[in-house]
Amino acid sequence: MGRAELAGRRVLVVGLARSGMAAAHVLVGAGASVVGYDQNGSLEVGRLRELGVELHLGREEERLLQGIDLVVKSPGVPGETVLVQGARQRGIPVWSEIELGARLLSNPILGVTGTNGKTTTSELLGAVFRAAGRPVEVAGNVGRPLTSLVGSVADDAWIVCELSSFQLEDVETLEPKVGVLLNIEPDHLDRHGSFDAYAETKLRIFERQAADDTAVVPRGFGPIPGTARRVEFAGDDELPAEPLIPGPHNRENAAAATAAARAAGIGDDAIAEALRTFEGVPHRIELVRELRGVRYVNDSKGTNVAAALRALASFPDSRLHVILGGLGKNEAYEPLAAAFKAGDAGYVIGTTGEKIARALETAGVPVTRAETLDAAVAASAAAAEATDVVLLSPACASFDQFRDFEARGDAFRALVLELA
């Protein structure tokens, strides 16, 4: 079902945040009759109402499926919801917003997935394409919905598309010309149910690839689906230039981006220019300021244990004051506690703070139960000395106290900039 087939169809969009809003817009433009649903009864949907979208907010009712030909699901909507399960039981196709975009766009897609490093690698690849003078758009989980490019992207542009596991749940025809898997580590187990199910979803990026496509995977990674040409990368690869962004994990990201860019036909001179000048993205091991010799680093995007471990490893020669906690993802925190060096300290906040505190104390790490971010910043700033690092890398989601990880990182930045 492409653009022509959507005309006259009755399509239900489930979830009307950023991705759902973009999907509804493009569906209306394709001539579909659009029904929009979101459980948030106070959601601002005036723009959709002006487009003629039939809106239903609040209570989820299966009756909304009557007469529906297609369901488009936003990434934040779990598969076990009433409407999604009801659609499957009725044989109604369920697409992700990414699937809708992939069907409506003819541009070559460079897809990037993985547990950690997706946004940094996607934005770095955007910088590589621009350094080569090649038209490019960066979209997907990185911020701009893929469907928002329909009708606006240049015909010859590549699309670098960051793909989360949520976005890969309901894809059928997505075929990235180049697909990149950075890593797979435990995350979102509360959504997927098991690590195996999570990993299987990540690997869907390769399922539809053909022999003339390229799959970029970590060195030594196991079997993958699809028939694409396989290219491997590792953090010790020889690169066209050393990346400006610090940390061994970012060298891995740079190696993956280099392999992907070469697969897209970009030369090493442009890759080198981007590696030397790309400064990274906010909330990923971002230096906020240095005050009296203490560096304050915002890694609010460190929403799982694996990401926090990478952040800790970025400062091997500094005493760390690490702010941890938030809404956990059913992970064990003992491996994180074991990564603390002698002299490091933890400051725990949020719903999962106590669980993290117990793991740290068992490992002999000093812990301050701060509960809130402002208290944690105050306590860590008071304890830190010159050459120390105060690091926000929570190893948890933010939703218990903040709208999202960006809001948490912004709050940390504001608190740090207020320190005198």
Regions picked out by a protein language model, each given a short descriptive name:
Residues M1-S96, L100, P246, R358:
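N-terminal leader/targeting and accessory segments in enzymes
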Residues L12, V35, E137, Y347, ...:
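Conserved beta-strand positions in the Rossmann-like core of class I SAM-dependent methyltransferases
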Residues G2-R10, G20-A30, P243-G343, R358:
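Nucleotide phosphate-binding/pyrophosphate-handling subdomain across enzymes
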Residues L43-R49, Y333-D388:
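C-terminal helical cap/extension that packs against the catalytic core
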Residues G15, L27, V71, V112, ...:
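Residue-level signal for inorganic ion chemistry
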Residues A32-Q39, A215-R219, H321-L324, K341-T352:
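Short internal beta-strands
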Residues E62-I68, P75-V216, P223-T227, D400, ...:
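Phosphate-binding loop of NTP-binding sites
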